[in-house]
Amino acid sequence: MERAPPDGLMNASGALAGEAAAAAGGARTFSAAWTAVLAALMALLIVATVLGNALVMLAFVADSSLRTQNNFFLLNLAISDFLVGVFCIPLYVPYVLTGRWTFGRGLCKLWLVVDYLLCTSSVFNIVLISYDRFLSVTRAVSYRAQQGDTRRAVRKMVLVWVLAFLLYGPAILSWEYLSGGSSIPEGHCYAEFFYNWYFLITASTLEFFTPFLSVTFFNLSIYLNIQRRTRLRLDGGAREAGPDPLPEAQSSPPQPPPGCWGCWPKGQGESMPLHRYGVGEAGPGAEAGEAALGGGSGAAASPTSSSGSSSRGTERPRSLKRGSKPSASSASLEKRMKMVSQSITQRFRLSRDKKVAKSLAIIVSIFGLCWAPYTLLMIIRAACHGHCVPDYWYETSFWLLWANSAVNPVLYPLCHYSFRRAFTKLLCPQKLKVQPHSSLEHCWK
């Protein structure tokens, strides 16, 4: 994030500054009352950011069911937000209250690199989370096949950090050497390229506009996919967004009913031995084998029928034909059961995907609300060299970025049952043991 020289960034607002006045060297002071109020609000934001994201990380330790590929990306986001609360905000509080950076030029460089890195990685993590959920809805089969590949997820997480550093890190560290010297006044801490409009518009395109358009595309694609599947289900279509499993189910041989050992054909044109049903008793699978073979009676004769008399030869086929009706009805029943099972599975997946879309829409909306004001004001401010945007509006805009780090942990339990259960396991373990389902409502009311 671009750090402005905080000359009068609160003093520009009389309502906020009160009796504040700029001191020599760009320093400023607030009235004791306003200093206490601002310090309390900033401390509250720090506590909320640190505790909320620490709870997310502890949830991964306490609940192994959370360690899925998508949730690893949420963990990566929580790590970024946690470090914002631990390192970035605390160092900025005295700077914004006094108007002077008192920690030296070296720590200023480190703070800028880390701050830009963490904020950018948060954005890239949101893109990664959105893309992962896009795949889970639109390419469900291949996505489920990759769920156990944690190394793949770790590689993506590392790539996010590398790209986030490359966007701003080299520029922060080398700009003053490439330009022939530093332009930052003593007692201030902000990036050398703060007023370079061309660099900022390029970086903003990569940091905000492209990610925001990407997550909007993923969210819209998920919505359209769900709408299409909902129409298919309402119209009586029994297919998911993908290959129809019904032809395969119809072409496969029926499976034996539960508790009926050996009474179903092994395959097309193959019957089971009749001696499994007892002497002189025809099993219901024999006629299925005969039907597949063209109705011949010799192969289906009982081993006990060694005389080959004509009476037995004519009676056996009649008994098999009488038994053919239960076999056909059983196959039809099983087909209907499979169709019902597929319909239930489709409804479950559709309901799950709708929840994914809703949670993703919430996260994306919060992301846009927190990042859009800062990005737009930063570009406008750089274009007019800081003279057309009041400092307090710019200051408020990048505090919204840090507020996003505190809000993200709240979005997880609101949008994900698995996180609600993990948080309950940490915060209300006794209620979870007594009432594992209803306790969630008591803990979060």
Swiss-Prot record:
Cytoplasmic compartment residues: 62-71, 131-157, 219-359, 420-445
SUPFAM superfamilies recorded: Family A G protein-coupled receptor-like (SSF81321)
Cellular component aspect of the GO annotation: dendrite; plasma membrane; synapse
An example Gene Ontology molecular-function term: G protein-coupled acetylcholine receptor activity
Entry's transmembrane regions: 41-61, 72-92, 110-130, 158-178, 198-218, 360-380, 399-419
SMART domains in alphabetical order: 7TM_GPCR_Srsx
Superkingdom of origin organism: Eukaryota
Protein name per the record: Histamine H3 receptor
Source species: Cavia porcellus
Species classification: Eukaryota, Metazoa, Chordata, Craniata, Vertebrata
